[in-house]
Amino acid sequence: MRLIIVSGRSGSGKSTALDVLEDNGYYCIDNLPAGLLPELAERALIHTELAQPLVAVSIDARNLPSHLSRFPELLEDVRAKHIQCDVLYLDADEETLLKRFSETRRRHPLSNANRSLAEAIQDESALLGPIADLADLKINTTHLNLYQLRDTIKLRLLNQPEPGTAFLVESFGFKRGMPVDADLVFDVRCLPNPYWKPELRAQSGLDQPVAEYLAAQPEVEEMYQDIYTYLYKWLPRFAASNRAYVTIAIGCTGGHHRSVYLTERLGQALQKTLKNVQVRHRDLS
């Protein structure tokens, strides 16, 4: 049995996450009272006719505060039944959440006559703290549209060929902000920038002319070797510590050239020595 617990602040994309999981064969329950989590797991184990039942539940601020505060012990109870259980926590910055509520005109579950929307969003963080602290995977949706979020969930949760730590090597551009869910961040903005070559500007690190230009730069090769040596040594230690997900982010200015090139090379090299290595380019349209 596999159980995925989806949580996060209102407006972060939980409904989209459940939709993706349902489309991929999961039996989904929205707004499950957290106190029922062990009972749900027990019943799914006993009564299901499926060899590998897939269940996803959403647990969020609509729960009783007393249930949310007990989440650590409830999760421990579920995992004691030898159930594969992943906790997915979605979030976005407060400005983005405020904008999303303004656009949809939906009421925040914690807002009332004495509490503004901004205060409700802040209070929600405290309520969901016990879940966020135990999340196996955190996805920040600030810069993701609906389709990018769906693709990210499928990539990180559903496309693992084998059990074990899932590694994501991700390129990004600093001008759009660092990925807040990254475990390791490497800044490669000091390297020669193909952007300043007019014939390369419109291309990306996936294109052969850009790759050839960067491969010819000694500093780029030195940077690649240093990052690869570090990852080759230390990523197995992350896996040995029972980490479910590890994100390695490579950043340049715009996220189109240098970071993309290095991310591709590192991903391909790591796939030869580690299981479950995926590659993603955040800022390529």
Curated annotation (Swiss-Prot):
Statement: the UniProt record of this protein carries the keyword Lyase: no
Chain positions recorded as GTP binding sites: 60-63
Annotated signal sequence range: none
Residues that bind ATP: 8-15
GO molecular function: ATP binding; GTP binding
Keywords: ATP-binding, GTP-binding, Nucleotide-binding
Role description: Displays ATPase and GTPase activities.
Family note: Belongs to the RapZ-like family.
Record NCBIfam families: PRK05416.1 (NF003828)
Name assigned to this protein: Nucleotide-binding protein Pfl01_0854
Lineage of origin: Bacteria, Pseudomonadati, Pseudomonadota, Gammaproteobacteria, Pseudomonadales
